[in-house]
């Protein structure tokens, strides 16, 4: 049959972003080809704990909501356990609203400290941001949460921020995580996968 042809060429896939390697049958010569295509941005937003993908008219979609920016942490201790909170009858991760004149990393650390009583936090990396919607007194809210992986060597007592409806704060072993995830929110499940 001759030279190898990538699927994009043989199946006629137009309008895709493809980086293809075309090699002859002896694999002695390779040629890289890049085909550019502007792909639409996709946003996954959780509505009543169900994910929906928004691709078109993001600005129009957002215009119907009041945007709240927040940050939180996926916090690991020295035993590789994950910090979780129990709030509103669901297992969750510590997070909260961005305050004025605060950057997103400061917000993430402050919220973990306030909601759990944990200190000595260090940010390891940015994980992702998630979106979810809810309603308060008839006002539609779109919350964007920036998530960070964090470490701590904290060994003290965990203290739930009861004013925020948090009734329990625990360190969770990996083998207990599935049980907690079953009673959690969609965006938290996604983050912990």
Regions found by a protein language model. Name each.
Residues 1-34:
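Intrinsic disorder/low-complexity segments
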Residues 22-23, 46-48, 77, 135-136:
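Acidic surface patches and DE-rich sequence motifs
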Residues 34-72:
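Acidic, metal-coordinating catalytic segment for phosphate/diphosphate chemistry
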Residues 63-92:
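Short, contiguous, helix-prone interaction/anchoring segments in small proteins
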Residues 98-186:
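Unchanged
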């Amino acid at each position: 049959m001759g030279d190898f042809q990538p699927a994009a060429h043989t199946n006629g896939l137009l309008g895709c972003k493809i980086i293809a390697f075309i090699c002859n049958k002896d694999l002695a010569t390779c040629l890289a080809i890049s085909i550019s295509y502007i792909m639409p941005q996709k946003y996954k937003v959780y509505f009543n704990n169900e994910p929906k993908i928004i691709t078109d008219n993001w600005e129009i979609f957002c215009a119907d909501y009041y945007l709240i920016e927040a940050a939180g942490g996926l916090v690991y201790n020295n035993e590789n356990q994950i910090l979780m909170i129990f709030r509103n009858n669901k297992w969750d991760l510590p997070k909260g609203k961005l305050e004025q004149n605060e950057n997103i990393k400061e917000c993430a650390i402050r919220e973990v400290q306030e909601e759990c009583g944990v200190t000595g936090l260090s940010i390891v990396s940015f994980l992702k941001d998630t979106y979810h919607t809810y309603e308060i007194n008839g006002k539609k809210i779109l919350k964007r949460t920036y998530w960070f992986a964090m470490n701590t060597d904290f060994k003290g007592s965990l203290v739930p921020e009861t004013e925020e409806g948090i009734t329990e704060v625990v360190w969770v072993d990996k083998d207990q995580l599935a049980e907690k995830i079953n009673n959690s929110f969609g965006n938290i499940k996604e983050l912990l996968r």
